[in-house]
């Protein structure tokens, strides 16, 4: 059976990659994300296509990852808005916390995204991440 005949009948979970640019270059990164990528971000149109497809396959929630989605909080907000328009909830946004500078600025970023559907962060912490990002972040 060739790949052209492969059909996904139902999707039970999934993820949307917003970007490949990342402040780290973790040796274990499946997608080879890092600072060598352009700082491009998924367009709202592409996000909408993905959410439409996810919903059509019976999936009502996904996670968001990258790269580092929170390097561009305004664009992340637009993606969260698109998910809401298609009735797709966000399980979590994965982050390496490199964007974190202090509690006050983090609260400002996160409080702006919460009404858009960001309720949970999955913070990546490992020896690979700690090579590039201080554990304290």
Range-by-range predicted roles:
Residues 111-137:
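Radical SAM enzyme [4Fe-4S]-AdoMet core and its adjacent flexible, acidic
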Residues 104-110:
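Alpha-helical scaffolding within the catalytic cores
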Residues 1-95, 100, 104:
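Conserved alpha-helical substructure of the radical SAM core
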């Amino acid at each position: 059976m060739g790949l052209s005949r492969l059909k996904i009948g139902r999707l039970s979970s999934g993820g949307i990659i917003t970007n490949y640019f990342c402040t780290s270059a973790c040796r274990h990164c499946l997608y080879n994300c890092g600072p060598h990528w352009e700082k491009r971000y998924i367009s709202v149109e592409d996000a909408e296509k993905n959410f439409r497809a996810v919903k059509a396959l019976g999936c009502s929630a996904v996670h968001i990852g990258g790269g580092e989605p929170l390097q561009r909080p305004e664009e992340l907000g637009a993606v969260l808005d698109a998910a809401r328009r298609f009735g797709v909830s966000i399980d979590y946004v994965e982050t390496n916390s490199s964007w974190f500078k202090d509690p006050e600025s983090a609260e400002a970023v996160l409080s702006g995204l919460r009404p858009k559907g960001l309720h949970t962060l999955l913070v990546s912490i490992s020896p690979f991440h700690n090579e590039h990002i201080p554990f304290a972040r």
